Amino acid sequence: GSQQGLDLIGKTMISPGDKVIVEGPTFLATIQCFRLYGAELISAPVDGQGVKTDELEKLIAEHKPKFVYLIPTFGNPSGALLSAERRKQVLQMAVKHQTLVVEDDPYGDLYFGEAPPPSLLAMSPEVPGSREWLIHCGSLSKVLSPGLRVGWMIAPPELLARATMCKQFSDAHTSTFAQATAAHYLKAGRMPA
């Protein structure tokens, strides 16, 4: 799913010693991935509404990170759900501090009852200029099939071009069968647009 996208972000963006802000706690595989490329991880505190944006802004101003990594919807392992207000604040911070935010969104369509707030990507039109500071990674692995390993990355063009080259060097392309299965699922309208 989105795990390969996170690896491509690490591979194309992180140099040894670069600072990356992550939620504390955050997804173990991401910690391992970013550390593999030499990142110094800085932990931003989380409560029941997700990352504490006042603390996050202090950390951004102090450390000037390469990027901020967040799982706004049902954070792993905390399960925290970043409120709509805080999501907007994160986008405003990205613009104010000219800092990339990586939104890992594998769980955005995996809910029961009331829908979670829109993704940072969906909210970005509300905050002028924020789209250029946002990388969004998504996955079908949680809602369709864990073994499918089909995901996507929406990113600024220059970063996406570098990630595409690294993807092609790594494995040429994702399985044709997996891509066709994902396309069939999406064309059938079983997932919200």
Model region roles, listed by residue range:
Residues 1-98, 108-128:
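Conserved core of the PLP fold type I
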Residues 125-193:
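Conserved core segment of the aminotransferase class I/II
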